[in-house]
Design a protein with these regions (language model features):
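Carbohydrate-associated surface elements
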Residues: 200, 220
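Aromatic "clamp/platform" in nucleotide-sugar-dependent glycosyltransferases that forms part
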Residues: 315
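A charged, aromatic-enriched C-terminal amphipathic alpha-helix characteristic of glycosyltransferases
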Residues: 232, 359-367, 373-404
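Conserved catalytic-core segment of nucleotide-activated headgroup transferases in glycan assembly
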Residues: 237-279
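Nucleotide-activated donor-binding/catalytic signature segment of Leloir-type glycosyltransferases, i.e.
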Residues: 278-301, 309
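Short hydrophobic beta-strand element within catalytic cores of glycosyltransferases
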Residues: 312, 332-335, 342
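Membrane-proximal helix-turn-helix segments that form the acceptor-binding/catalytic region
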Residues: 152-194
């Protein structure tokens, strides 16, 4: 079996983490696998490019720069195609699986992608298409993260905010939504199978494109994290005041980090110690430790291991890997209500909370937080979580899925 994983970025973001992990696990299993990505920072080759085998940067820098510049006006990526891979795919001996992940974010023109798939299928009928939906982009006119907006159910009549990612200056979502959805119907006609790690994304997709069109395979922790877990000694009792972690790529973004909730935790003063991990922290105080954005996962996991809990308040994530990772190392997660957090936590017997319930919880010991969130002791919660978010299980589900296509 020959598998090509496609994602806009190689090693940045949750979708990249899933795609890259599937790629690495497939290679370990002796399968033929390649990872095709759009671009790295600034449109250049990813800084992680040389760290992984069988990876290919696919898009010229000028294409991504042009898409970034024009997207704000046109609400779609005007340029970018996969035509330079046509011969590679069609000349491959044996069945080929093209597994798409995130294709938006200034990488590819969707119409060009569908046309490419049609040509490949006509030339090489044993090609199969799989598309993992990591966000809501397949149902909206423009954005990937709806942040609570349900305008897509009414064909994106008027965007309530132009700032939902990817942001724009002019709202053209209503003009684009039907044409975009037709392209997804065209992919279904080509036999593309859609998967999502999260039930609520699958439900949204199925409500538009037909019952059962999108199936569920939950995300799992990656190979690197599993290696780190094997070496980490779980910290059951932390010394001093409760240590609470907040993790986000950009800590300023309220959609990912509820700014008021963090400030309310800061107002607890010396009752807690707040640790942030991410860029551009706007939080400064006597009880705040800003670690910055930690690119070394080993260091991040080691730091989280010493925390009483991770507080998660994102409204825009769909099946956040950081939750799977924290839970797998035995760090309780105190999450505010959202479909994503509820879905992840329920898998290990946990629950979510309202904002006003968070403040009393963060003042508890690690064991008491585990009891409050998961209804069990710390060790039982840790063992349950380790099994629930297994990356090996994710691979086995996908490989079984590929083989049954």
């Amino acid at each position: 079996m020959n598998i090509l994983q496609f994602n806009v970025r190689l090693a940045e973001g949750g979708a990249a983490g899933v795609a890259l992990d599937l790629h690495q696990r497939a290679l370990q299993k002796g399968l033929q696998s390649r990872f095709v990505y759009g671009y790295g920072k600034g449109g250049k080759k990813s800084v992680s490019h040389d760290n992984y085998p069988q990876v290919l940067k696919q898009t010229p820098r000028l294409t991504s720069i042009a898409n970034i510049a024009l997207f704000r006006l046109f609400n779609r990526d005007l340029f970018g195609n996969l035509n330079n891979l046509y011969r590679t795919v069609t000349h491959t001996r044996g069945p080929v699986v093209l597994h798409f992940h995130v294709l938006h974010s200034y990488w590819l023109n969707l119409e060009e992608v569908v046309a490419f798939c049609g040509k490949v299928k006509a030339h090489k009928p044993d090609t199969r298409f799989v598309w993992t939906l990591h966000d809501h982009w397949s149902v909206t006119g423009r954005c990937a993260f709806t942040d609570g907006c349900e305008g897509w159910k009414d064909n994106c009549q008027k965007c309530p905010t132009l700032s939902n990612y990817p942001p724009v200056k002019v709202d053209r979502a209503h003009q684009l939504v039907e044409g975009k959805r037709q392209l997804f119907r065209d992919m279904l006609s080509l036999g593309c199978t859609f998967i999502s790690p999260s039930q609520h994304v699958a439900d949204a997709f199925n409500s538009l494109y037909g019952a059962g069109r999108c199936q569920i395979i939950n995300n799992g922790i990656d190979v690197a994290t599993e290696e780190i877990l094997a070496e980490l000694t779980p910290v059951a009792i932390t010394t001093g005041k409760p240590k609470i972690a907040v993790v986000a790529h950009d800590l300023r973004y309220d959609g990912k980090t509820n700014q008021q909730l963090v400030r309310d935790m800061m107002a607890l003063g010396d009752k807690i110690e707040l640790h942030t991990f991410g860029k551009f922290s706007p939080f400064e105080g006597a009880n705040v430790v800003n670690h910055g954005f930690e690119t070394d996962k080993r260091k991040l996991m080691s730091a989280l291991n010493g925390m009483n809990a991770l507080v998660f308040s994102s409204r825009v994530d769909n099946y956040p890997l950081i939750l799977c990772e924290a839970l797998s190392i035995g760090v309780p997660v105190i999450a505010t209500h959202s479909d994503a957090a509820r879905e992840v936590l329920e898998k290990s017997g946990g629950k979510t909370f309202s904002e006003n319930e968070v403040l009393p919880l963060v003042q508890l010991s690690k064991a008491d937080i585990a009891q409050a969130v998961f209804g069990t002791d710390l060790e039982s919660f840790r063992n349950r979580s380790r099994k629930a978010y297994s990356g090996q299980q994710m691979l086995e589900e996908y490989v079984s899925f590929y083989q049954n296509l």
